[in-house]
């Protein structure tokens, strides 16, 4: 795929426009607006495979959620995702990408998941410039299949800039915005700034056909008056193949 698209690392939070074959091991550690501590082992990450150079299919198994309160711990919901690469070019031919994504979350957890299934359409893209910078943006929504008055709907708009500092290190700064409609959060905005970093590990004699590792970390910091959580630390290890 390196001949067809850019070679940036997958963002910590924002939807990834590139097509990749991977598995992500992740953990998130956050504090709710009430000050309670929640850990998500898995963080709704999983794996994906690429087919026909334009399609990616992902399966995101449920993470295990530990509340550190009287709330019941347990697994969350499962999500399936499909991507279609609309247009792209590698660094030698424009360094850009535009991709459509469609996810479906299955309400599989009565205590730690959503009340109903939901659809998640997203349009994501990015472009590189000045040899070592790239900017990306993704606009999408969460549309439950029922119980709208209870769950509401939301629009997600994420943007970022990445800097390829060294052959092995990328730095990232994301902005993650969620606009709420209906439910008790109707009309509210939740916004985070997310600084992050990635270390790419490849063996000394690595070839493009061989797998490699990416280690990532970052923290979501609330910048809006309304937020359901804050100081969300994210740790990841990825295997790309």
Give each language-model segment a name.
Residues 1-241:
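Transmembrane beta-barrel domains of Gram-negative outer membranes and organellar outer membranes
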């Amino acid at each position: 795929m390196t001949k067809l698209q850019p070679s940036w690392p997958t963002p910590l939070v924002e939807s990834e426009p590139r097509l990749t074959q991977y598995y992500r091991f992740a953990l998130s550690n956050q504090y709710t607006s009430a000050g309670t501590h929640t850990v998500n082992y898995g963080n709704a990450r999983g794996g994906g495979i690429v087919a026909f150079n334009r399609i990616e299919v992902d399966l995101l198994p449920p993470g295990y959620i530990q509340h550190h309160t009287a709330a019941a711990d347990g697994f969350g919901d499962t999500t399936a995702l499909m991507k279609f690469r609309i247009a792209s070019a590698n660094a030698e031919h424009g360094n850009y990408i535009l991709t459509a994504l469609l996810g479906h979350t299955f309400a599989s957890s009565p205590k730690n998941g959503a009340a109903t299934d939901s659809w998640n359409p997203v349009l994501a893209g990015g472009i590189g410039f000045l040899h070592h910078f790239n900017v990306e943006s993704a606009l999408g929504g969460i549309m439950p299949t029922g119980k709208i008055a209870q769950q509401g709907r939301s629009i997600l708009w994420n943007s970022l800039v990445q800097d390829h500092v060294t052959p092995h290190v990328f730095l990232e700064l994301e902005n993650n915005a969620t606009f709420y409609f209906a439910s008790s959060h109707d009309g509210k905005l939740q916004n985070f700034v997310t600084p992050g970093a990635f270390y790419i590990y490849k063996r000394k004699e690595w070839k493009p056909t061989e797998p490699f590792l990416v280690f990532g970390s970052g923290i979501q910091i609330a910048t809006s008056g309304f937020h359901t959580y804050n100081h969300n630390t994210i740790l990841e290890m990825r295997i790309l193949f």
